[in-house]
């Protein structure tokens, strides 16, 4: 018995050493941060971070959320999800975090002067929202980014992960319905559309229609997905996100669902905090390892 106990602790200690060595190796990877202008049909800036070296590397695309007001979009940061993106880069990925069309300098909507920026992911009025096309619009941008980065010989064309938050997560779910061959897996944080109508917590735009649209995407989606939501998300609360997941799975989609404990004052922006990385990274690591 004494020998068995010693063997158990020796094995456990060895496993801990392996994980510690892996963590140190990942943290010591040198990375390089850049700002790119992507010459797509609708040109856009992107934050890019990658390991130092020529590559090619597996690709991660990170889709941000939506701001409906032009003023808010005009102040949108050029670098979004920096800490999360660097986490992926230290694990060998080239990460592209595009700033959507209609954000930053392109947020020029002045209706009284008949000036409108190229913001194309509105869902319309809550009486008849079009969640479906709003998601697919951003999904098409992801496909163009994959094509462009592959043509530049910077990435491994058949090794792409797509990550999205909020409306960007919704676009990632939409992308999964297209089953693009290069995309191996998709990770959605706090995904959805139509949250906090009029700025009111847990006040959603046509939630039944959102669930229906989720099921519609699930009918054709076969890409492995990881969905992460947070208990104190006032945009897409647990009851709604669980309904969405159930509808998606019942329709045929493949998605692993996790509801995380409350985080800060508002869980919706979980992925944007460096303090959240130790909480979500084990789930993401396990999920991505399972796709290899």
Q: What residues fall within each predicted segment?
A:
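Alpha/beta-hydrolase active-site loop
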Residues: 113-153
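N-terminal cap/lid segment of alpha/beta-hydrolase-fold proteins
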Residues: 26-55
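Primarily recognizes the serine-hydrolase "nucleophile elbow" in alpha/beta-hydrolase
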Residues: 140-210
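Alpha/beta-hydrolase
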Residues: 63, 98-100, 189, 260
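C-terminal catalytic histidine-bearing segment of alpha/beta-hydrolase fold enzymes
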Residues: 242, 251-292
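The conserved beta1-alpha1 loop
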Residues: 63-65, 229
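Short substrate-entry loop that stabilizes the transition state in hydrolases
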Residues: 55-57, 65-107, 237
């Amino acid at each position: 018995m004494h020998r068995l106990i010693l063997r158990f602790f020796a094995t456990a200690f060895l496993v801990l050493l392996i994980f510690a060595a892996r963590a140190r190796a990942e943290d010591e990877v040198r990375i390089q941060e850049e700002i790119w202008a992507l010459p797509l049909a609708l040109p856009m800036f992107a934050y890019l971070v990658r390991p130092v070296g020529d590559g090619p590397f597996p690709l991660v695309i990170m889709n941000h959320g939506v701001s409906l007001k032009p003023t808010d979009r005009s102040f949108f940061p050029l670098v979004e999800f920096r800490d999360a993106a660097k986490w992926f880069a230290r694990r060998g990925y080239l990460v592209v975090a595009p700033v959507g069309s209609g954000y930053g300098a392109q947020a020029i909507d002045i209706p009284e002067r008949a000036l409108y920026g190229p913001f194309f992911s509105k869902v319309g009025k809550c009486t008849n929202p079009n969640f479906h096309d709003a998601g697919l619009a951003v999904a098409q941008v992801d496909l163009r980014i994959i094509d462009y980065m592959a043509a530049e010989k910077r990435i491994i064309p058949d090794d792409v992960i797509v990550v999205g938050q909020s409306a960007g997560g919704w676009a990632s779910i939409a992308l999964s319905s297209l089953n693009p061959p290069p995309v191996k897996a998709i990770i959605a944080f706090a995904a959805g559309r139509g949250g906090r109508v009029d700025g009111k917590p847990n006040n959603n735009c046509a939630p039944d229609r959102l669930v229906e649209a989720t099921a519609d995407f699930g009918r054709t989606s076969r890409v492995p997905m990881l969905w992460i939501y947070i208990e104190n998300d006032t945009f897409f609360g647990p009851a709604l996100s669980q309904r969405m997941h159930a509808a998606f799975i019942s329709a045929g989609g493949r998605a692993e669902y996790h509801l995380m404990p409350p985080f800060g004052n508002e869980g919706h922006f979980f992925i944007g905090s460096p303090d959240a990385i130790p909480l979500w990274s084990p789930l993401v690591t396990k999920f991505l390892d399972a796709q290899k």
